[in-house]
Structures are given as structure tokens and as C-alpha cells.
Amino acid sequence: MDINNVSWSEEMCNLLNIPINRLPEIKNSADEYGETSLFGGKIKISGIAGDQQAALIGQGCFKAGEAKSTYGTGCFMMLNTGPDVKLSKSKLLSTIGYQIDGKVSYALEGSIFMAGASVQWLRDNLEFFPSAPEIENLAKNSNKNSNVSFIPAFTGLGAPYWDPEARGAIFGLSRETTKNDISQALLEAIAFQTKDIFECMSSDGVDLKSLKIDGGMVENKYFNQILADVLNLKILLPDNKEATAKGAAFLASLGSNLSLIHI
């Protein structure tokens, strides 16, 4: 799809030998798409979005300059750039945030491949703790002068490096290093990776004053504070951490002309 004019690209279709008339109609994010009978009855489909676009909507980022960062298996930071495509000079992705009533809002996106999945690695592979939330207490009780650094590049590095061959490493280990110190280093690493994306957005001319966060990791209040300190930015927490589901519900309700008051 050509995001500049929100239509299928004849050039790409010809290159890939795809008949353009076989592709579906491009519609609003909230629209009448049809019905499904997957669950035994007719269910109306009235909203469609990618997961990060849904989270952008669920966090209420409807104005240019508003941004959200979702911390689940990975981390995905997305910035509403308004009605015009903004091409990044810092290797961020230009994409469509949503289209409502024929009006498109574009976005910049940066991805961190491993966030919550790195916490799971400490839990499952190194058996640091029996459940992921326990990393909070370990990190709180770490030696803040341990100088341990963690690079969680288990599956490469995302934005702005885009290096699929990069691999993880832990530096600064000594005989005094504890699992508490390594846990602290991991939370710091996720925050600093977020800062990489934040600085890319800043260099692209965006002056962020705050960042809305969501996802499973935001239950870790200690991580949220690390993030605020590293970014030197106001961090805004949602009433419901599942912003992606909230955004999908918003679009489905809007497309069905239902009340949005309880979403």
C-alpha cells in the first residue's frame, strides 16, 4: 500500500505480479467490514487495526505530538505525526496511525524486540525468580554502583540500529555481582533502548513533553520510575494497562455507532 495517498501501489503490484483488482477495498479503521461466524453466530466486524495502532488509539493519542510506548513481549513506541507523512532521518518507521471518517493520521514507530521477553529469559533460563513481577523487588535491592550493563539483543536490535545479527551480552560482572544487579541492569537496558527511540523522535523535530505507557511491564512501578529518570520525561499511566484491547473496542464501537462512554 502507498501510505502517501492511502491506495494500493500499482508499481509494487506490478513488481510482485499481483493483480491490483484482487486486493480488498481500503476502508476506515472504524467501518463496516462484514460479519464472521467463527463463534457460532453472526458477529459484525466494524473495526480493524494493527496492535500498535490500536494501542495508540487506546491511549487517546489523537493529536500530533502525542506518543505511547507499549511494554509487552517487546516494546513499541509510536508517535502521532498528524495529517502528513513524516519521513524519519533517524531510521524510524513511517506508517499510518489510523483513518477515521476519511481523515488519516500518520505516525512514526520504533521497535525494541525484547522487553518483557527478556524478563522471561531471566525467569525461565536463569531461574532468577518464579514469576516475572518479582524482578521488581530484586532490582530494588541491587547495588546501584555495580556497573553491570545488559544488552538484551537476544534476537538482534531494533530501532534505530536494525541489526538482526546483534546478540546479547552482560558486561561488568565481578564476584560480587548478584542476580539483583543483573535484574537492575536489564530494566535499565529497556529504559535506555526507549531513550534511543525517544532521541530519534527528538532529532526528527518532535518535542515530546510526556509519554503514555501501557502493557504488562507497566505494573512494575520501579521500572516506570527508571524510565522517567532515564528519559527525564513525565510518564503517564493508563487506567487500563491493556490499551491495545481498548483501542480495538473503541474502533468496533465507533464503526457500529455504539456508545463509547464506557470504553
Q: What kind of region is each of these model predictions?
A:
Residues 1-3, 27-28, 33-38:
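Short beta-strand-loop/turn "lid" adjacent to the catalytic site in phosphate-handling enzymes
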Residues 10-31:
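A conserved helix-loop-beta module that forms one wall/lid of the active-site cleft
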